[in-house]
Curated annotation (Swiss-Prot):
Keywords: Cell cycle, Cell division, Cell inner membrane, Cell membrane, Cell shape, Cell wall biogenesis/degradation, Magnesium, Membrane, Metal-binding, Peptidoglycan synthesis, Transferase, Transmembrane, Transmembrane helix. The chain crosses the membrane at residues 19-39, 48-68, 95-115, 119-139, 155-175, 180-200, 227-247, 284-304, 349-369. GO terms for cellular component: plasma membrane. GO terms for molecular function: metal ion binding; phospho-N-acetylmuramoyl-pentapeptide-transferase activity; UDP-N-acetylmuramoyl-L-alanyl-D-glutamyl-meso-2,6-diaminopimelyl-D-alanyl-D-alanine:undecaprenyl-phosphate transferase activity. Belongs to the glycosyltransferase 4 family. MraY subfamily. It comes from Acaryochloris marina (strain MBIC 11017). This is Phospho-N-acetylmuramoyl-pentapeptide-transferase. The gene is mraY. Pathway: Cell wall biogenesis; peptidoglycan biosynthesis. The lineage of its organism: Bacteria, Bacillati, Cyanobacteriota, Cyanophyceae, Acaryochloridales.
Amino acid sequence: MVLANKTTASTRSGAGRNLYWLLLLCLSGVALATDIYSGRIDTPALTIVAPLWTSTLVVTLLGFWAVPMLRSLKASQVIQEDGPQSHLKKAGTPTMGGIFFMPVALVLGWAWVAANSVNLLEVSAAVLLTLCLGLVGWFDDWQILRKKSNKGISAKLRLGIELGSGLIFGLWLFLTRSDISGLALPFGLSLPIGVLFLAISTFVVAAESNAVNLTDGMDGLAAGTSAIAFLGLALVVAPSWPGLMIFCACFSGSCLGFLAHNHNPAQVFMGDTGSLALGGALAAVGLITNTLWALLILSGLFLVESLSVIAQVTYYKATKGPDGVGKRLFKMSPIHHHFEQSGWPEVRVVSTFYACVAVLAVAACGLNALS
């Protein structure tokens, strides 16, 4: 029995590692191919593949120091007792991994853009918004570790900061950009929204950051899907916003570098420090470049994860009987746990979700090309 368990664990470890290498090769190939096709390869500093590979390498190497450090600091993930029973074995795995891969993405992205003098103001704004949400996530992680429970800062406080950050960011864009009051749509169409842009900005920042946060529930899930989404967004904004293309490439690469330590079985989790910041970075680029339609497609999986939680809670409350117990739409939410509870191995769920985001990325890039 012990030998069988070891064999199963070894097989899962190999499957997670193989999935990581497949994703790394695929994203690298796409980045290189599009750089060659577009002619960007003639100017290596303004390609996608160069910052992507650089950030991947830096984060991968940094992880060999950061992960043991987090472990020595006893920054261990608190596992929910009412969560999937298979996750109990993850107890003791260090969390707050966002503290070593997010700074690489932010610093490298900003420095790369500054060195090439492209879209520096816009990238600086994206860095500030991402940093703000990352700090909120870090404080939440710290409170969870300090209390040894899953209760960090209050949900109202966290949501308030997210909404406030989105409002301030939107106000800056609205006051400095004359084109931002029209919501860009595919095929050159535009929807005049005027001051409603502020409400959209506020919602997008909060929704995107929380959606990525909800997706971070399996080894390699949030990191891998975010890497694909950032590369897709980089391809969408590349023709008009080379600086933000580089910013997205650095984030995609940093996610891949983190995934080297986060693939199944994970040696570290990103925590709210990483997931909230990733969502904030995606939202920032979508808002600045007025490509929210593309962001909506690229974030389709994150949206489904969020909707599954909303639907689960709503249905449970609506069907609550005299005994105070309601019915559930899913075996567990977010929806990735539903598949896990249905008997799917983690790696199968994660690989399926990777494929879904890849299809969405192709759709977003294809629609952008047609437009």
